């Protein structure tokens, strides 16, 4: 048995791993980009550096398939610009902060670092935490895409997709959006028999904690889930 004397120097403190994460909001609304960064920083480890950007051109919000198509060039340009930066500033992982996960396949082909979509991160987290989850999203036009992603990512775990039909920018700017979103979450849990809720819009990130308190079930925000998953993946990547 080893004996440590008083003269033995203490073991060095564990150095925090600096992880650089870049969140790309594919729409052009800067207030939403700032809210995404705030949500990510609240979830991140102290050794994680969070940056969030949005393209200068493209849709102001992403609420249908056409918006998703139009946002991809600007999204990919932001990722390419960051990847071409100096080594000490280059992101260790990228997060596409739109629930449709637009451009995810193309972004992964363009860079070596991990690229996460907030829908994929949230749905995998919800599938692990529950016997089945409901998605509560923004506009009805996004419901087919959410179902498509759910079947691709977590087949059988998604029990329903529900739209509050509140525009994305209103969710971002109006705290009063919380009440109808919370009521829809309650309806979804009852109707689907689910035991968790996935928030299907990055603008809903600030509602995750109060919804958990109100509903008493896991409420998964994709920004938070992607932050924590990216932190775990970076040390495992090449």
Task: Enumerate the predicted regions with their spans.
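Periplasmic-binding protein-like
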Residues: 23-24, 88-98, 193-201
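N-terminal beta-loop-helix "entrance" segment that forms/cooperates
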Residues: 52-77, 169-174
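Active-site rim beta-loop-alpha module in soluble metabolic enzymes
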Residues: 141-200
């Amino acid at each position: 048995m080893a004996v440590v004397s008083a003269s033995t120097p203490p073991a060095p403190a564990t150095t925090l791993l600096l992880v650089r994460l870049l969140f790309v909001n594919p729409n052009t609304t800067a207030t939403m980009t700032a809210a995404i960064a705030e949500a990510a920083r609240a979830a991140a480890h102290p050794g994680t550096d969070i940056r969030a950007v949005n393209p200068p051109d493209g849709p102001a919000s992403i609420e249908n398939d056409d918006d998703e198509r139009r946002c991809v060039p600007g999204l990919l340009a932001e990722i390419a610009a960051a990847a071409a930066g100096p080594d000490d500033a280059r992101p260790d992982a990228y997060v596409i902060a739109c629930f449709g996960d637009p451009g995810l396949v193309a972004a992964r082909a363009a860079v070596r670092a991990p690229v996460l979509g907030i829908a994929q991160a949230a749905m995998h987290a919800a599938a692990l935490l529950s016997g089945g989850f409901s998605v509560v999203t923004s506009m009805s036009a996004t419901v087919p895409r959410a179902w498509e992603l759910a079947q691709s990512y977590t087949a059988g775990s998604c029990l329903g997709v529900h739209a509050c039909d509140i525009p994305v920018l209103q969710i971002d700017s109006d705290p009063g959006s919380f009440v109808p979103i919370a009521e829809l979450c309650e309806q979804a849990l009852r109707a689907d028999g689910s035991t968790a809720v996935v928030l299907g819009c990055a603008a809903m990130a600030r509602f995750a904690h109060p919804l958990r308190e109100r509903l008493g079930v896991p409420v998964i925000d994709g920004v938070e889930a992607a932050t924590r998953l990216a932190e775990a993946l970076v040390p495992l990547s090449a």
